Amino acid sequence: MKIITPRVPSAETGFSYARPFFEDLVDTALAHAKKLGATDAGAEASEGYGLSVSVRKGELENVERNRDKSLGVTVYVGQRRGNASTSDFSRAAIERTVQAAYDIARFTAEDPVAGLPDAEDIATTQPDLDLFHPWALTSEQAAKIALECEAAALATDRRITNSEGAGVSAQQSHFFSAHTRGFRGGYASSRHSLSVAPIAGKGAGMQRDAWYSSMRCAEELASPEAVGRYAAERALSRLKSRKISPR
Protein backbone atom coordinates (compact mmCIF):
# COMPACT_ATOMS: atom_id res chain seq x y z
CA MET A 1 0.00 0.00 0.00
CA LYS A 2 1.37 3.38 -0.97
CA ILE A 3 1.76 5.83 1.90
CA ILE A 4 0.57 9.32 1.06
CA THR A 5 2.87 12.27 1.56
CA PRO A 6 1.99 14.09 4.79
CA ARG A 7 0.67 17.57 4.23
CA VAL A 8 0.33 20.24 6.86
CA PRO A 9 -3.37 20.81 7.63
CA SER A 10 -4.75 24.30 8.01
CA ALA A 11 -3.21 26.66 10.53
CA GLU A 12 -6.44 26.39 12.51
CA THR A 13 -5.43 22.96 13.82
CA GLY A 14 -1.66 23.32 14.13
CA PHE A 15 -1.15 19.62 13.37
CA SER A 16 1.65 18.35 11.14
CA TYR A 17 -0.31 15.38 9.80
CA ALA A 18 -3.77 15.19 8.30
CA ARG A 19 -6.24 12.42 9.11
CA PRO A 20 -5.97 10.77 5.64
CA PHE A 21 -2.25 10.27 6.29
CA PHE A 22 -3.00 8.58 9.61
CA GLU A 23 -5.61 6.39 7.94
CA ASP A 24 -3.03 5.22 5.43
CA LEU A 25 -0.45 4.52 8.15
CA VAL A 26 -2.94 2.41 10.07
CA ASP A 27 -4.14 0.55 6.97
CA THR A 28 -0.54 -0.21 6.03
CA ALA A 29 0.13 -1.65 9.48
CA LEU A 30 -3.03 -3.79 9.46
CA ALA A 31 -2.34 -5.13 5.98
CA HIS A 32 1.20 -6.11 6.95
CA ALA A 33 -0.02 -7.84 10.11
CA LYS A 34 -2.42 -9.98 8.09
CA LYS A 35 0.34 -10.70 5.58
CA LEU A 36 2.51 -12.05 8.40
CA GLY A 37 -0.27 -14.38 9.49
CA ALA A 38 -1.94 -12.49 12.33
CA THR A 39 -5.43 -13.60 13.29
CA ASP A 40 -6.41 -10.00 13.97
CA ALA A 41 -4.71 -6.66 14.49
CA GLY A 42 -5.37 -3.11 15.58
CA ALA A 43 -3.38 0.08 15.09
CA GLU A 44 -3.55 3.70 16.19
CA ALA A 45 -1.70 6.73 14.84
CA SER A 46 -1.58 9.87 16.95
CA GLU A 47 -0.01 13.29 17.19
CA GLY A 48 0.04 15.94 19.87
CA TYR A 49 1.60 19.33 20.45
CA GLY A 50 1.48 21.99 23.09
CA LEU A 51 3.04 24.66 25.25
CA SER A 52 3.67 24.67 29.00
CA VAL A 53 4.97 27.70 30.91
CA SER A 54 5.73 27.97 34.62
CA VAL A 55 6.62 30.94 36.81
CA ARG A 56 7.64 31.30 40.45
CA LYS A 57 7.89 34.33 42.72
CA GLY A 58 7.27 36.71 39.86
CA GLU A 59 9.91 35.25 37.56
CA LEU A 60 9.70 33.06 34.49
CA GLU A 61 10.90 29.58 35.42
CA ASN A 62 10.33 27.27 32.47
CA VAL A 63 9.02 27.27 28.89
CA GLU A 64 8.45 23.92 27.25
CA ARG A 65 7.08 23.11 23.81
CA ASN A 66 6.20 19.55 22.87
CA ARG A 67 5.33 17.87 19.60
CA ASP A 68 4.94 14.10 19.66
CA LYS A 69 3.79 11.42 17.25
CA SER A 70 3.30 7.69 17.53
CA LEU A 71 2.01 4.59 15.79
CA GLY A 72 0.97 1.78 18.09
CA VAL A 73 0.22 -1.73 16.83
CA THR A 74 -1.47 -4.68 18.54
CA VAL A 75 -1.25 -8.08 16.86
CA TYR A 76 -3.24 -11.19 17.78
CA VAL A 77 -2.12 -14.72 16.97
CA GLY A 78 -5.01 -16.80 18.18
CA GLN A 79 -5.41 -15.89 21.84
CA ARG A 80 -1.92 -14.46 22.10
CA ARG A 81 -1.24 -10.76 21.86
CA GLY A 82 1.77 -8.57 21.16
CA ASN A 83 2.24 -4.78 21.20
CA ALA A 84 4.83 -2.49 19.68
CA SER A 85 5.09 1.19 18.79
CA THR A 86 7.22 3.61 16.82
CA SER A 87 7.58 7.33 16.22
CA ASP A 88 9.03 6.70 12.75
CA PHE A 89 6.32 6.87 10.10
CA SER A 90 8.37 5.43 7.23
CA ARG A 91 7.05 2.26 5.60
CA ALA A 92 10.12 0.28 6.68
CA ALA A 93 9.64 1.35 10.30
CA ILE A 94 5.96 0.44 10.19
CA GLU A 95 6.76 -3.04 8.91
CA ARG A 96 9.45 -3.51 11.58
CA THR A 97 7.01 -2.44 14.27
CA VAL A 98 4.33 -4.85 13.06
CA GLN A 99 6.92 -7.63 12.88
CA ALA A 100 7.98 -6.89 16.47
CA ALA A 101 4.39 -7.04 17.70
CA TYR A 102 3.82 -10.26 15.76
CA ASP A 103 6.96 -11.88 17.20
CA ILE A 104 5.94 -10.91 20.73
CA ALA A 105 2.49 -12.41 20.18
CA ARG A 106 3.94 -15.69 18.89
CA PHE A 107 5.94 -16.23 22.05
CA THR A 108 3.45 -14.88 24.59
CA ALA A 109 1.24 -17.13 26.70
CA GLU A 110 -2.35 -17.47 25.56
CA ASP A 111 -4.96 -15.25 27.21
CA PRO A 112 -8.51 -16.65 27.00
CA VAL A 113 -10.03 -13.16 26.98
CA ALA A 114 -7.60 -11.54 24.53
CA GLY A 115 -9.07 -10.42 21.23
CA LEU A 116 -11.06 -7.80 19.41
CA PRO A 117 -14.77 -7.17 20.07
CA ASP A 118 -17.47 -8.98 18.15
CA ALA A 119 -19.07 -7.19 15.21
CA GLU A 120 -22.23 -6.31 17.14
CA ASP A 121 -20.15 -4.57 19.81
CA ILE A 122 -18.25 -2.31 17.42
CA ALA A 123 -19.24 1.36 17.32
CA THR A 124 -20.40 2.44 13.87
CA THR A 125 -21.24 6.08 14.58
CA GLN A 126 -19.17 8.78 16.24
CA PRO A 127 -21.00 11.77 17.70
CA ASP A 128 -19.24 15.11 17.64
CA LEU A 129 -18.54 15.86 21.31
CA ASP A 130 -17.01 19.28 20.58
CA LEU A 131 -13.68 18.36 22.20
CA PHE A 132 -11.28 20.32 20.01
CA HIS A 133 -10.63 24.00 20.70
CA PRO A 134 -6.99 24.85 19.88
CA TRP A 135 -5.43 27.70 21.82
CA ALA A 136 -3.00 29.83 19.80
CA LEU A 137 -1.04 30.88 22.87
CA THR A 138 2.43 32.44 22.80
CA SER A 139 4.93 31.83 25.58
CA GLU A 140 4.72 35.53 26.51
CA GLN A 141 0.94 35.36 26.83
CA ALA A 142 1.14 32.17 28.89
CA ALA A 143 3.72 33.69 31.23
CA LYS A 144 1.55 36.78 31.71
CA ILE A 145 -1.46 34.66 32.69
CA ALA A 146 0.61 32.55 35.08
CA LEU A 147 2.12 35.66 36.71
CA GLU A 148 -1.34 37.17 37.17
CA CYS A 149 -2.52 33.98 38.82
CA GLU A 150 0.41 33.83 41.22
CA ALA A 151 0.12 37.55 42.02
CA ALA A 152 -3.56 37.12 42.84
CA ALA A 153 -2.74 34.33 45.26
CA LEU A 154 -0.02 36.34 47.00
CA ALA A 155 -2.27 39.40 47.27
CA THR A 156 -5.15 37.54 48.89
CA ASP A 157 -3.84 37.75 52.45
CA ARG A 158 -0.64 38.81 54.22
CA ARG A 159 -0.38 35.27 55.56
CA ILE A 160 0.36 34.01 52.05
CA THR A 161 4.13 34.18 52.34
CA ASN A 162 5.48 32.24 49.41
CA SER A 163 4.64 30.32 46.28
CA GLU A 164 5.67 27.07 44.66
CA GLY A 165 4.75 28.63 41.35
CA ALA A 166 2.01 28.89 38.78
CA GLY A 167 1.66 27.32 35.36
CA VAL A 168 -0.28 27.49 32.12
CA SER A 169 -0.59 24.63 29.64
CA ALA A 170 -2.19 24.38 26.19
CA GLN A 171 -2.33 20.91 24.62
CA GLN A 172 -3.86 19.65 21.37
CA SER A 173 -3.92 16.13 19.91
CA HIS A 174 -5.64 13.90 17.38
CA PHE A 175 -5.63 10.21 16.52
CA PHE A 176 -7.03 7.61 14.15
CA SER A 177 -7.62 4.01 15.17
CA ALA A 178 -8.80 0.93 13.28
CA HIS A 179 -8.74 -2.85 13.52
CA THR A 180 -9.26 -5.82 11.26
CA ARG A 181 -12.84 -6.45 12.37
CA GLY A 182 -14.11 -3.22 10.89
CA PHE A 183 -13.79 -0.44 13.44
CA ARG A 184 -12.49 2.88 12.12
CA GLY A 185 -12.54 6.15 13.99
CA GLY A 186 -10.72 8.98 15.65
CA TYR A 187 -11.02 12.59 16.67
CA ALA A 188 -9.12 15.70 17.73
CA SER A 189 -9.19 17.04 21.27
CA SER A 190 -7.68 19.77 23.39
CA ARG A 191 -6.96 20.29 27.08
CA HIS A 192 -5.88 23.60 28.57
CA SER A 193 -5.11 24.41 32.19
CA LEU A 194 -4.04 27.06 34.69
CA SER A 195 -2.72 26.27 38.17
CA VAL A 196 -0.98 27.80 41.18
CA ALA A 197 0.37 26.52 44.52
CA PRO A 198 0.69 29.20 47.25
CA ILE A 199 2.20 28.75 50.71
CA ALA A 200 0.66 30.21 53.88
CA GLY A 201 2.32 30.88 57.22
CA LYS A 202 5.93 30.78 58.36
CA GLY A 203 8.43 28.33 59.78
CA ALA A 204 7.14 25.00 61.05
CA GLY A 205 3.58 26.21 60.64
CA MET A 206 3.74 26.71 56.89
CA GLN A 207 0.98 25.11 54.86
CA ARG A 208 0.75 24.56 51.12
CA ASP A 209 -2.26 24.05 48.89
CA ALA A 210 -3.13 24.51 45.25
CA TRP A 211 -5.93 24.96 42.76
CA TYR A 212 -6.37 24.73 39.03
CA SER A 213 -8.81 25.16 36.18
CA SER A 214 -8.81 22.73 33.25
CA MET A 215 -11.05 22.96 30.19
CA ARG A 216 -11.27 21.86 26.57
CA CYS A 217 -11.80 25.48 25.54
CA ALA A 218 -9.47 28.19 26.88
CA GLU A 219 -12.31 30.71 26.96
CA GLU A 220 -14.02 28.58 29.61
CA LEU A 221 -11.06 28.57 32.01
CA ALA A 222 -11.57 30.31 35.33
CA SER A 223 -9.85 33.70 35.49
CA PRO A 224 -6.27 33.84 36.81
CA GLU A 225 -7.53 35.99 39.69
CA ALA A 226 -10.21 33.47 40.68
CA VAL A 227 -7.81 30.52 40.58
CA GLY A 228 -5.18 32.42 42.56
CA ARG A 229 -7.59 33.60 45.26
CA TYR A 230 -9.17 30.18 45.74
CA ALA A 231 -5.77 28.48 45.96
CA ALA A 232 -4.75 31.02 48.62
CA GLU A 233 -7.95 30.43 50.57
CA ARG A 234 -7.27 26.71 50.55
CA ALA A 235 -3.75 27.25 51.88
CA LEU A 236 -5.02 29.65 54.57
CA SER A 237 -7.64 27.15 55.70
CA ARG A 238 -4.85 24.75 56.64
CA LEU A 239 -3.20 27.12 59.12
CA LYS A 240 -3.41 26.08 62.79
CA SER A 241 -4.94 22.78 61.79
CA ARG A 242 -4.84 20.00 64.36
CA LYS A 243 -5.52 16.31 64.46
CA ILE A 244 -9.03 15.21 65.32
CA SER A 245 -9.29 13.19 68.51
CA PRO A 246 -10.27 9.56 67.88
CA ARG A 247 -12.59 9.72 70.88
Where are these predicted regions, by residue range?
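Active-site bordering "gate/hinge" segments
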Residues: M1-R247
